[in-house]
């Protein structure tokens, strides 16, 4: 609550106050706890009685309040109740976790979120496709502190927070809104073989290559492995010099995408072409994730090779 300024009148305070006294005095500790609890209580009343006025406070100081979720375990539940979020259900207006809980799907076991640098980029992330297709609301988190408090074991209404860019999607039990658009559960044998080819070609650039159940329209995306941190948290830790070695990402491939099926149908004569495509798919996933190709020169050469091949095929 460092954005709050005020005066406190107490007969128990000595006239001479030192920094050591502020840090060690039980009186100051009691005052701090009492004032903090009172302010949070008043904010809760304001949020309930005048949501528009509270929204203005959240616009200006929401990121600071969320620091308390990470640092103040005692008041975590109160701060979560006060928190407001942009979501896939409401990009223009703030939503509370109580609102989110009311829209949970029957088989939904977690509060899903995606973290990044800005809301506009998060809105178009391919990771959202499978969740949107099922009507599952996802929190859009764009403040740096978000990546830390969601990974600190916080939960709301008995539901943990789960990143949609980390590990498995857990969407199998939630039905699609449009049952006619449901892809086949079976994956073509040629696609399975192509995924194995991609994994072998990319080597240690990725930890795994696997079929995705979170992609609907996009061909590929990058996922953080179960054993590592969320993708955005990893970027923040690396930028602050607090990450010794980044975990190798998982490349998820949409096995029902027309491009993937077409590439999987290519014969052995197209080996070098398929090698270039495997690396281009990884670079595409990096770009969609907000990163750059690891080697821009090789990316350009491979792209030129694939485009030339496409033009020659079109003339035949």
For each feature predicted by the language model, list its residue ranges.
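Conserved GHKL (Bergerat-fold) ATPase module
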Residues: 1-316
């Amino acid at each position: 609550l460092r954005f709050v300024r005020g005066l406190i009148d107490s007969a128990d305070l000595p006239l001479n106050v030192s920094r050591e006294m502020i840090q060690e005095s039980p009186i100051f500790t009691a005052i701090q706890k009492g004032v903090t609890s009172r302010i949070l209580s008043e904010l809760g009343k304001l949020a309930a009685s005048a949501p528009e006025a509270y929204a203005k406070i959240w616009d200006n100081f929401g990121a600071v309040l969320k620091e308390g979720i990470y640092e103040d375990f005692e008041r975590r539940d109160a701060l979560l109740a006060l928190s407001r979020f942009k979501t896939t259900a409401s990009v223009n207006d703030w939503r509370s976790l109580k609102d989110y809980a009311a829209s949970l799907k029957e088989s939904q076991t977690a509060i899903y979120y995606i973290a990044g640098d800005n809301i506009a980029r998060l809105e178009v992330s391919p990771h959202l496709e499978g969740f949107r297709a099922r009507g599952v609301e996802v929190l859009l988190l764009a403040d740096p502190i978000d990546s830390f408090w969601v990974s600190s074991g916080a939960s709301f209404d008995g539901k943990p927070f789960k990143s949609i860019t980390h590990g498995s999607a857990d969407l199998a039990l939630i039905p699609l809104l449009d049952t006619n658009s449901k892809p086949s559960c079976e994956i073509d044998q040629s696609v399975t073989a192509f995924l194995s080819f991609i994994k072998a070609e990319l080597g240690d650039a990725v930890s795994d290559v696997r079929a995705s159940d979170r992609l609907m329209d996009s061909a590929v995306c990058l996922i953080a492995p179960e054993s590592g941190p969320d993708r955005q948290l990893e970027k923040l830790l690396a930028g602050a010099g607090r990450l010794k070695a980044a975990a190798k990402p998982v490349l998820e491939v949409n096995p029902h995408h027309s491009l993937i099926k077409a590439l999987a149908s290519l014969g052995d004569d197209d080996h070098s072409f398929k090698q270039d495509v495997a690396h281009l798919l990884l670079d595409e996933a990096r770009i969609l994730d907000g990163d750059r190709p690891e080697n821009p020169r090789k990316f350009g050469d491979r792209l030129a090779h694939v485009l030339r091949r496409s033009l020659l095929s079109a003339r035949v």
